UniProtKB/Swiss-Prot annotation:
Biological process annotations from GO: protein catabolic process; proteolysis
NCBIfam families registered for this protein in UniProt: PRK00033.1-2 (NF000669), PRK00033.1-5 (NF000672)
Similarity comment: Belongs to the ClpS family.
Function, as annotated: Involved in the modulation of the specificity of the ClpAP-mediated ATP-dependent protein degradation.
Subunit field text: Binds to the N-terminal domain of the chaperone ClpA.
Protein name: ATP-dependent Clp protease adapter protein ClpS
Disulfide bond sites: none
InterPro entries per the UniProt record, alphabetical: ClpS, ClpS_core, Ribosomal_bL12_C/ClpS-like
Pfam families listed in its UniProt record: ClpS
Organism: Nitrosospira multiformis (strain ATCC 25196 / NCIMB 11849 / C 71)
């Protein structure tokens, strides 16, 4: 923003107030048909987890009915949900993946 001060131009700094983007949890839901090994593969492939991390999340999904795979900005979370669901369908598994605001 510019202001005039006796014929001189004085620039005023305007502070930008950017907020971080809203974050979304990507959640796998349990079902009675998708094999545990497939869930581990999904977690390793789409969420870059090692086998131990993937197994822990898979067991949480199995025992509690759902497990958080990660927290991402909206567009990344949405893409991951679509990729997981498409991969599961491609392999004929009913695995569900959803996202919710963190």
């Amino acid at each position: 923003m510019a202001a005039r001060n006796h014929g001189e131009v004085v620039l005023e700094a305007k502070k930008s107030k950017l907020k971080p983007p809203p974050m979304f949890k990507v959640i796998l839901l349990n079902d009675d048909f998708t094999p545990m090994d497939f869930v581990v593969t999904v977690l390793q492939t789409f969420f870059s987890m090692n086998r131990e991390q993937a197994t822990q999340i898979m067991l949480k999904v199995h025992m509690d009915g759902a497990g958080v795979c990660g927290v991402y900005p909206n567009d990344v979370a949405s893409t991951k949900v679509e990729q997981v669901v498409a991969f599961a369908r491609q392999h004929q598994h009913p695995l569900q993946c959803v996202m919710e605001e963190n």
